[in-house]
Regions:
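Helical element adjacent to the flavin cofactor pocket in flavoenzyme catalytic cores
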Residues: 35, 62-74, 86, 94-162
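A short coil-to-beta-strand element that immediately follows conserved catalytic motifs
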Residues: 46-47, 133, 184-186
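Residue-level detector of anion-binding/catalytic polar loops
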Residues: 77, 131, 181
Length: 186
């Protein structure tokens, strides 16, 4: 069943629709990240100089640029860079310039130290009343109608107003305990 669904989503129209949805979510997430960073004054070696995606072959760069056209339609700034422009943007690549066919630059993207970010965001969350539970195995989602009202763990029952299920391919296993089927597979 999953395989057929996957193949159905390989069509051009489905790809465009899915890319739009994923990009909209990514842009919303980036806006929320920026808001939280500003409100909480988080310090995590934030780098707002964009993202440089480097290519060794023109074929793979062309494939990325085809997708980038859709990104541009949705408001994402994308710049195609020649090998020379790539080296100007990142001089450390000059030693391997003969192996680079160019790059795609996303000036609106940003990065930072993930460890520092998680430490900072955790501290900010604790100040707002969040309680973290570590070394607890989640065994079951307790459902009441359309709402998850608790999680059964080896540390006891954890109740809450809202839950975020973020376990990657393991999400579907835990979701199944509440009769929720997620099309996520390893």
């Amino acid at each position: 069943r999953w395989g057929l669904s996957f193949l159905a989503n390989c069509r051009e129209a489905a790809w465009r629709e899915n890319t739009r949805a994923i990009l909209a979510l990514a842009l919303d997430s980036l806006a929320e990240l920026r808001r939280i960073v500003d409100v909480e004054n988080l310090s995590y070696d934030r780098n707002q100089t964009g993202l440089l995606k480097i290519f060794r072959s023109s074929g793979s760069m062309e494939a990325t640029l085809r997708a980038a056209k859709l990104y541009e339609e949705l408001g994402v700034s994308v710049k195609r860079l020649t090998t020379k422009e790539t080296i100007e943007k990142e001089p450390a690549l000059s030693a391997i310039s003969d192996k680079i066919s160019g790059a795609v630059f996303y000036p609106g993207d940003e990065s930072g130290d993930a460890f520092k970010f998680t430490q900072e965001i955790s501290a900010a969350a604790i100040k707002r009343g969040v309680e973290f539970k570590f070394n607890c195995d989640m065994n079951e989602l307790i459902r009441n109608g359309d709402k998850i009202e608790a999680v059964k763990t080896n540390c006891g029952l954890i109740s809450g107003d809202a839950f975020i299920l973020s376990l990657g391919s393991y999400s579907s296993i835990l979701a199944k305990t509440a009769n929720v089927m997620l099309p996520i597979y390893p």
